């Protein structure tokens, strides 16, 4: 796992703190902030599948059980699994199918991680959502935790919706359009803003 702070992190924190009192307070509250990545694009995407539409705590528990069933959480191993191999892990049948399809894409070369470094955010998202089960939210989680891109604002994320509603809208959860408009104030550091808003809901460091 890469636990080194992204090169842009300190500047982003300084800019956000100067512009937004809510984020200034959160950044000061969590000075140990590290946006870590797992260093393995397949595992990062697989974790994002597991975490779709459930809490971080639940996702961590399911991932631990899933990893325990695999000799190695790698494309060649996961591609050979069937639903029976994963009974009791807490994964839905659909998520099992998605994980196997993702593994096949890596295993046969239809996904080539080397190309992502030269692609902008929207190009990476477009490539990823061509994979079965990967929607925009999953692709955005990969941009944040896999590529550690600085300006990702996942408007479909439940935690981000809750935090923005709590801090900026008097407890009212915003619509996707409202959240999209709100995010413009945090550009070009929306990943960092997202990460601290997540921390406000769960003081444990968010990882995928």
What role is predicted for each listed range?
Residues 1-33, 117, 121-122, 136-208:
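C-terminal accessory module of base-excision DNA glycosylases/AP lyases that mediates lesion recognition
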Residues 18-48, 53-71:
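A positional/architectural concept
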Residues 22, 54-55, 59-132, 187:
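Alpha-helical ds-nucleic-acid-binding substructure associated with the helix-hairpin-helix region
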Residues 33, 48, 52-53, 69, ...:
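Alpha-helix C-capping/helix-to-loop hinge sites
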Residues 35-43, 90-94, 183-190:
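Structural motif
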Residues 37, 57-61, 73, 94, ...:
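Alpha-helix N-cap and coil->helix boundary residues
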Residues 44-49, 65, 81-85, 123-127, ...:
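A general alpha-helix detector
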Residues 45-50, 99-103, 142, 193-197:
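Short alpha-helical scaffolding segments that buttress acidic/His motifs in well-ordered protein cores
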């Amino acid at each position: 796992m890469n636990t080194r702070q992204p090169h842009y992190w300190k500047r982003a924190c300084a800019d956000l703190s100067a512009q937004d009192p809510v984020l200034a307070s959160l950044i000061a509250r969590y000075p140990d902030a590290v946006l870590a990545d797992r260093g393995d694009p397949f595992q990062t995407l697989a974790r994002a599948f597991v975490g779709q539409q459930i809490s971080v705590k639940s996702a961590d528990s399911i991932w631990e059980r899933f990893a325990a069933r695999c000799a190695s959480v790698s494309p060649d191993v996961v591609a050979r699994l069937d639903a029976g191999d994963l009974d009791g892990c807490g994964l839905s049948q659909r998520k099992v199918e998605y994980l196997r399809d993702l593994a096949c894409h890596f295993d046969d070369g239809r996904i080539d991680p080397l190309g992502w470094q030269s692609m902008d955010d929207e190009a990476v998202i477009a490539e990823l959502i061509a994979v079965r089960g990967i929607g925009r939210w999953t692709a955005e989680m990969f941009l944040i935790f896999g590529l550690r891109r600085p300006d990702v604002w996942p408007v479909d994320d439940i935690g981000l919706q809750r935090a923005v509603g709590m801090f900026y809208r008097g407890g009212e959860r915003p619509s996707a359009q409202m959240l999209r408009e709100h995010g413009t104030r945090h550009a070009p550091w929306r990943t960092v803003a997202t990460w601290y808003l997540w921390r406000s809901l769960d003081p444990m460091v968010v990882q995928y």
